[in-house]
Amino acid sequence: EVIEVFAYSCNHCFNFETNIELFEKTKAQYIDFKRMPVVFNEAYKMHARMFYTAESLGILDVMHIKIFKAFHLDRKQMMTESEIFELFSEQGISKDQFENRFKSFTVESKVNRAERLTRKYKIRSTPTIVVNGKYTSNGPSTRTFEDIIAVTRELALKEYSSK
């Protein structure tokens, strides 16, 4: 399992997106790739709620990059429910659909799980890659985005080979 831990408000994560998309398309079949929004505090919870709401509505593929662009190109803060809904409404999502998912037990549970895993994996910065719950991409061998991807592939192969 390979998890990309990211934050929509993180400029490095936005810049890393091209690399991680390429990784996702070219990863080995044995790699189960997932994304997880980091949850450091209440502001990050709101951002995680956006991710899991988009996922539950089946529009994450479209919304993921749109949310990044809203932060980094349009300079939106995305801190209020109404501002977030505005972005979702551009995809044809009604206010009722949005509110039912945004405040749902399922979305809240996933946000809480992301918060627990943020602590468990000792995430201090983003983007961070977690391989099999054991290894993270922080350290002297990962100075560039390409290094992060290379180390991720090596660690995933190591874990797969040790089974």
Q: Where are these predicted regions, by residue range?
A:
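C-terminal cap of thioredoxin/glutaredoxin-like
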Residues: 90-163
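Structural alpha/beta surface segment adjacent to cysteine/selenocysteine redox centers
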Residues: 3, 8-86, 154-159
